[in-house]
Each structure stands twice: as structure tokens, then as C-alpha cells.
Amino acid sequence: MRLTRCWAALAAAIILNLLVFFYVSWLQHQPRNSRARGPRRTSAIGPRVTVLIREFEAFDNAVPELVDSFLQQDPAQPVVVAADTLPYPPLALPRIPNVRLALLQPALDRPAAASRPETYVATEFVALVPDGARAESPGHLERMVEALRGSSARLVAAPVATANPARCLALNVSLREWTARYDPAPSAPRCDALDGDAVLLMRSRDLFNLSVPLARPLATSLFLQTALRGWAVQLLDLTFAAARQPPLATAHARWKAEREGRSRRAALLRSLGIRLVSWEGGRLEWFGCSKESARCFGTVAGDTPAYLYEGRWTPPCCLRALRETARYVVGVLEAAGVRYWLEGGSLLGAARHGDIIPWDYDVDLGIYLEDVGNCEQLRGAEAGSVVDERGFVWEKAVEGDFFRVQYSENNHLHVDLWPFYPRNGVMTKDTWLDHRQDVEFPEHFLQPLVPLPFAGFMAQAPNNYRRFLELKFGPGVIENPEYPNPALLSLTGG
């Protein structure tokens, strides 16, 4: 049957409407990032840079806007959003091959490679972009790459125009002393670390050769590792825009983010072995042991703590506890009229630099046995363990006939009190340990006692303490430091 012109026109109209309908439907199902709302510029550098977004809060963020802003500059821009676990609420990310979500916490149903961030980065460079930034001006990544290529620095940074833009800091990290110290940068814009919001660009191989490349807080973790390696960061005269709808806009969201940030930072620093941070301006922040926690090391074998084998000295929190305990014990002894003096390694530390030896793990004091009865705490310790009003624990040591004062019931950093008594002009005692310095000595070293700076206060010491120390340890002991048991581990590496 032949179709009339009317039927043909009707069929054509239906087909045209169907085509329009399917096209509009297809557009609506495309990711919003793939539909440019303005002119787009394809970057010649883009394929060599991966945008990596790690620092954001799952409960309140502007990550979709951030991703969208980079895709508007270059639809082919590789973007990786990294999180420990699947973010909740879910992130509204475009479902396109060059935008990927990396979950870093291992899971039973995923291969090991899926938890390694380098699996998701195939480019020469990586840009670490914080939440709250926005790619608004074309070519920023290209300029950062060129700046990195032309610099001796291993990282370059561009501030983000937020309320807290990045600024330069100097950073000194000492693993041996468990410390990190921040100061004003002497040669900005070249610095060791940054404080504030910035986009960081570095070579991918450098990032993924770090011990923990994406640990949070990211900036804290990253700069501790790069400063330790001597890698400088160059702060560029280049600014990224802030998000149009910035994250953490409410007071509650900011409070929650700050609380979780503090918790993450403390966990990070403890895991990296940093026990003390000195912030710019001199504020100290401690991340080690306290009266409420156990000390930072376990039982000592062979007079050589485990940390010495790791190339470290006594953690600063432990030294602080020893200083506090020593000052307190000396105050109690002096108030009770108990004659005491610095002994052993503690006297050696006082003679060298007026403090505890930096790898020592206790404090030793000698006391006159006949004065023990003058001190209420020592009398109580004769019968059993005594916890005084300051939380210090006074007790008889299980190793022999001497006293021990512990920092607390939880923290067993301690001061040992060795009771001596005179016999024919020689100071002796009833308990001897297998230490070279544990020997008798003439009483004239104690007549009189002399004041000596030690651990932040003035303590009593034997007169002619150099001869006293050389009697116990050997000639030249003050000038030639050595670990307590060089047969096991020597300071000189022999």
C-alpha cells in the first residue's frame, strides 16, 4: 500500500522527535563535568600531571566542585581522589575513566595493588590539591611543571586564596632526638615546609618513594619526610582560587574537622616516632608518654635500651619525666635532711653538660643509709610501695637493698636511691650490681658535698667530681662519651 504524503510527513516528524528526545536524554545522563559551561582549553602538560585529592573531610567537603574545576580546564585531566575507606556520604564524582577513587585501606576482597596509591598514578608529576581549592585560571599546572623543571627544589607550591594561604617555614627533624622544630624560613620563598593551604607539585617517583606518601594530615606528614631528606619546596608567585562554596562553612563542621585533625596529627607523629614538636614562636607540643601512660620503651636488657639499636636516644618525653622526678625527689630529700649526691651516669651527665646524658634512662642518687629514717616516704617504702600526694611511687627495688621512686604507677621511669654507709673512711653498701662504676670510694669525696647544675636545678655532688668519676669509670670519661655497654653497642660504632 502506498503511503500518502500526509502519512510520510507524520512519520518523519515522529522520527525527528524521537531523535531529539534521545539526544536530550543522553545529555542529561552525561557527568556534569563533561559538559563545559565555558570555553575549554586542552593542556599540553595535562597527561603528565595527575591531580591527587587526599586532604578532605568526608562529612563536609567541596571535592565535586574541585574535580569539576580541573575537568573544565582539561576534560582529559587525570584525577585521583584518595581516601582510607569509602567516603560517606558518597562523593558525587563523574563516572569517567580519568577520574578514579582510590581506597587505601586494605580489604579482603581487593588485591594488594588496589590499596597502593601509585597504582592509580601513571604520570610523571602529581599535584596534591587540598579541598577548598579551585582551578580557575588556565595553565597553572603547566607553569608549576616548568617551575619545578627549572628549580633545584624537589617540590613547588602555589598558595590557595583561602583565609589561610600558605607561607614558608623552616623545619628541622631529628629522628635521633625524636623531635621536629618549626621556625620562620630564613630564605623564603624557598623553604622546608609550608603552613596553610597550597597546591603542591612534585615528581610522582619522589612522592611514592616516601615512607608514607599519603598519611594524614598530608602536609604535616609530607614535609616531615621531605625535610628529613633535605628536599626544599619553592613557593611560587602563583595562586589557585578558593572554592565558590567552601567546605566546613559552619562552626560545627569546623569544630569537628579541627578535633579529628588533632587526633590524626597525634597518631601520625607517634607512628613516625616524633615525640616533641617545637612550633614557630616556641610553643611545645608533646606526643609521648605522661604520668597516665607507660614509658616509651620496655624492659632494658644489657644496660642498652632498644631505642639505641634504632639509632635513637632517650625520647624527650622520657627525659622530661626523669627531670621532673629527679627535681621532686631531691626536694623531698633536702626538706627531710637526707644527705644525697649525684651518682654514676647522672653525675657524669652533670659534669659534661649539666643534664641527664641524652641516652640515659634513669637517674642515680647516693644517700646516707643513716638518714633514711628522716624521710617519711623512705620509711613508708621499707614496708611496701607508697604512692604520695603527687602520684610518685616510692618503693624498695626488687633487684636489691635500695630504693626506687617511679614517675607514676603507670609510668616506671625512675630515680634510684642507693644507701651507702661509711666503714673505715670508705663508703660502701649492701647491694652491688655488675656495673663497672659500682665500687666503694673514700668518704672524703662527700665532705663536703658541692652544688652542681643538673636537669634544670642545683643538685649536690661529690667534691672533686672529676677524680670521683675517673675512679669509677676510668681516665678521660668526661671527655669521651660512650654508651653504657659498649661490648653490645658502641657510640663510636666499634
Curated annotation (Swiss-Prot):
UniProt signal peptide: none
Annotated positions binding Zn(2+): C289, C296, C317, C318
Disruption of the gene: reported phenotype: Embryonic lethality before 12.5 dpc.
InterPro entries reported for this sequence: FKRP_N, LicD/FKTN/FKRP_NTP_transf, LicD_transferase
Posttranslational modification: N-glycosylated.
Biological role: Catalyzes the transfer of CDP-ribitol to ribitol 5-phosphate previously attached by FKTN/fukutin of to the phosphorylated O-mannosyl trisaccharide (N-acetylgalactosamine-beta-3-N-acetylglucosamine-beta-4-(phosphate-6-)mannose), a carbohydrate structure present in alpha-dystroglycan (DAG1). This constitutes the second step in the formation of the ribose 5-phosphate tandem repeat which links the phosphorylated O-mannosyl trisaccharide to the ligand binding moiety composed of repeats of 3-xylosyl-alpha-1,3-glucuronic acid-beta-1.
Protein name: Ribitol 5-phosphate transferase FKRP
Source organism of this protein record: Mus musculus (Mouse)
Lineage per the UniProt record: Eukaryota, Metazoa, Chordata, Craniata, Vertebrata
Gene name as annotated: Fkrp
